[in-house]
Amino acid sequence: MTDTTAHKYPLLATPHVRLHGTVDDAMYDSFCNQLAACPKDGMLVVTITTLGGDPEVARAMGDDIRLIREFQGRDILFLGKVAVYSAGATFMSAFPVEHRFLTHGTRLLLHERQITKTINLNGPLRMVVASLQAALNEVETSVAIEEEGFRDLIKGSKVPFDELHEKAPSNWYIEAEEARSLGLVLDII
């Protein structure tokens, strides 16, 4: 981290919201409680360390960040620590690149959403077709949501969508230094 950046972002040393563990309903509750206890004006810092979890919870937390930024005009900084995997990267995508930081040695994990589903075909043929179509609709909608998140994550960076789309199926691990050089984060502290 440069001296200029250190002076510009002294709050990184004392985050307002500290999240760790699985991205789930319990994390969302903690996030909301900590956010409610934050100062009502000025810049905020949110940190996360996670091996992943529920991407929809990550999107909900990200929406809260976006709403605060847009309706209150507040700057909110993201600080990823140690591991920002999967749903953690989904949460990070809610922050503009210029408001993202990682600690030294942190790794990002970007991958495609996963699904495990058994489809039981039983009954009248038209009902079977409807069941198959419903499952296909679920997958197609999930792919669209995933691609929206990928585009948010790389917006303002040097990473082309096609590169992320190519690497995500095999779990793309990105070290902090590489994330900075790719423009996915502003700096490393």
Feature names for model-found ranges:
Residues 1-189:
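Terminal-region recognition feature
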